[in-house]
Curated annotation (Swiss-Prot):
<feature type="region of interest" description="Disordered">
    <location>
        <begin position="285"/>
        <end position="335"/>
    </location>
</feature>
<keyword id="KW-1133">Transmembrane helix</keyword>
<feature type="compositionally biased region" description="Polar residues">
    <location>
        <begin position="294"/>
        <end position="310"/>
    </location>
</feature>
<feature type="modified residue" description="Phosphoserine">
    <location>
        <position position="260"/>
    </location>
</feature>
<feature type="compositionally biased region" description="Basic and acidic residues">
    <location>
        <begin position="248"/>
        <end position="259"/>
    </location>
</feature>
<feature type="topological domain" description="Cytoplasmic">
    <location>
        <begin position="1"/>
        <end position="80"/>
    </location>
</feature>
<feature type="modified residue" description="Phosphoserine">
    <location>
        <position position="293"/>
    </location>
</feature>
<dbReference type="GO" id="GO:0071782">
    <property type="term" value="C:endoplasmic reticulum tubular network"/>
</dbReference>
<comment type="function">
    <text>Endoplasmic reticulum (ER)-anchored autophagy regulator which exists in an inactive state under basal conditions but is activated following cellular stress. When activated, induces ER fragmentation and mediates ER delivery into lysosomes through sequestration into autophagosomes via interaction with ATG8 family proteins. Promotes ER membrane curvature and ER tubulation required for subsequent ER fragmentation and engulfment into autophagosomes. Required for collagen quality control in a LIR motif-dependent manner. Mediates NRF1-enhanced neurite outgrowth.</text>
</comment>
<keyword id="KW-0256">Endoplasmic reticulum</keyword>
<dbReference type="GO" id="GO:0071786">
    <property type="term" value="P:endoplasmic reticulum tubular network organization"/>
</dbReference>
<feature type="topological domain" description="Cytoplasmic">
    <location>
        <begin position="188"/>
        <end position="192"/>
    </location>
</feature>
<dbReference type="InterPro" id="IPR055258">
    <property type="entry name" value="RETR3_RHD"/>
</dbReference>
<protein>
    <recommendedName>
        <fullName>Reticulophagy regulator 3</fullName>
    </recommendedName>
</protein>
<feature type="transmembrane region" description="Helical">
    <location>
        <begin position="81"/>
        <end position="101"/>
    </location>
</feature>
<dbReference type="GO" id="GO:0032991">
    <property type="term" value="C:protein-containing complex"/>
</dbReference>
<feature type="transmembrane region" description="Helical">
    <location>
        <begin position="169"/>
        <end position="187"/>
    </location>
</feature>
Length: 466
């Protein structure tokens, strides 16, 4: 049981917050109850004096300026009478109490006896003072009750603080009293009292006419221009810092830029403007097109229209004709006639057209060399005939060579008989026979010796030559 009570006595954070919330709610509820109780008491006390309170409020808010001015003069006269009179304070206090007693006797004893009683119908009804902008007795009592309760709570907390922290309370009270003593030393107490009276008289007027709101509306543009706020002050400080940083960076940049310019000027030679203008000037009386002169500064002076030739540059004036330039470099191309020695089916480089080298027998080799040489001699004219005028030789070189080879092969095929493929295969077998006989003797049985008539039947072209 004791452990459970200990756990309950030590609540967690959530329970502590809930406890504080309940305590605050209970404190506000107690305060409201106190305000209501004080309001009821004040209404009972000030209820009979509602007309007088309404007149005092009207005078304080200057609803009727004439009466308000009279009230203000009377209060000032009374204040300065009590302040400057040579009478003693005890006499003044006794005289004030005597006046208060007389007024009370007149109000409660003498006036009710001489006053005419009201009808019963009027006594049964409750009447109240109504003004659109002035406070009624209940409203005034409510505000006075709130001030009274707030003051009592402050005094209660101050006494509690005195009991719990006597040292701090002593320091706080000494500081406040010292401030009041210094203030009373430099400003007289009479003047402070008069200032308090003026503030009490002018406060209802300021609240009634909303002078604070009007003053704020008028002073707001001025405050925005002057920028007296803390935010504006901090922003101005930040702007000043940024401007200082920019100025420092600009100075550093100018210093570095000047240093770099001085270094570059030390390395670069200084040229005279007249010399440069004379070198750049181009006239007919200067050097010829083939001359290249060197000036004193080490620069080349080239005449008009002249460009020095480098090692890899081309002389365009020497070879202006594209056909001539192509014909000059044509012998450098490799021959298109392939040597048939040692070829078999795997390394055949033909493009499917019959060839004279494969088709001619051993005896007819001399007769077939002449057409091949003719075709080889006619290759440049064939390529030049197919060359388009003014075209780019580099881009069309591959297409021109391939077209020339195909046309040459077709021209050779037109001179032969269409029955060329079978003798080609036989000739290949005949050419491979000597090399295969060197390997083994058994492979010799695969070949058959033919007569001259059979050879003539297989190759009519060779029979014609014989």
């Amino acid at each position: 049981m004791e452990e459970a009570e200990g756990v309950a006595a030590a609540p967690g954070p959530a329970s502590g917050l809930a406890f504080r919330g309940r305590r605050a709610m209970s404190g506000s509820w107690e305060r409201d109850q106190q305000v209501e109780a004080a309001q009821r008491t004040l209404v009972e006390v000030l209820g009979p004096y509602e007309p007088l309170l309404s007149r005092v409020q009207a005078a304080l808010v200057w609803e009727r300026p004439a009466r308000s001015a009279l009230w203000c003069l009377g209060l000032n006269a009374a204040f300065w009478f009590f302040a400057l009179t040579s009478l003693r304070f005890v006499f003044l206090l006794a005289f004030s109490l005597m006046i208060i007693v007389c007024i009370d006797q007149w109000k409660n004893k003498i006036w009710p006896e001489i006053n005419v009683p009201r009808p019963d119908a009027l006594d049964n009804e409750s009447w109240g003072f109504v003004h659109p902008r002035l406070l009624s007795v209940p409203e005034l009592c409510h505000h006075v009750a709130e001030v009274w309760v707030s003051g009592t709570i402050f005094i209660r907390n101050l006494l509690l603080f005195k009991k719990q922290n006597p040292g701090k309370f002593c320091l706080l009270s000494c500081g406040v009293l010292t401030f009041l003593a210094m203030l009373g030393r430099y400003i007289p107490g009479l003047l402070l009292s008069y200032l308090m009276l003026v503030i009490i008289m002018m406060w209802p007027l300021a609240v009634y006419h909303r002078l604070w709101d009007r003053a704020y509306v008028r002073l707001k543009p001025v405050l925005q221009r002057l920028d007296f706020s803390v935010r504006g002050y901090m922003m101005s400080k930040q702007r000043e810092r940024q401007l200082r940083r920019r100025a420092l960076h600009s100075e550093r940049a100018t210093d570095s830029h000047s240093d770099s310019e001085e270094e570059l000027a030390a390395f670069c030679p200084q040229l005279d403007d007249s010399t440069v203008a004379r070198e750049l000037a181009i006239t007919d009386s200067e050097h010829s097109d083939a001359e290249v002169s060197c000036t004193e500064n080490g620069t080349f002076n080239l005449s008009r229209g002249q460009t020095p030739l480098t090692e890899g540059s081309e002389d365009l004036d020497g070879h202006s004709d594209p056909e001539e330039s192509f014909a000059r470099d044509l012998p450098d191309f490799p021959s298109i006639n392939v040597d048939p020695a040692g070829l078999d089916d795997e390394d055949d480089t033909s493009i499917g057209m019959p060839s004279l080298m494969y088709r001619s027998p051993p005896g007819a080799g001399d007769t077939q060399v002449l057409p091949a040489s003719r075709n080889e001699a006619a290759l440049p004219e064939l390529l030049l005939s197919s060359l388009p005028g003014g075209s780019n030789l580099t881009s069309n070189l591959a297409s021109l060579v391939s077209q020339g080879m195909i046309q040459l092969a077709l021209s050779e095929a037109s001179q032969t008989d269409p029955s060329g493929p079978p003798p080609r295969r036989a000739t290949r077998g005949f050419l491979r026979a000597p090399s295969s006989d060197l390997d083994t003797d058994a492979e010799g049985d695969d070949f058959e010796l033919l007569d001259q008539s059979e050879l003539n039947q297989l190759d009519p072209a060779s029979s014609r030559s014989h």
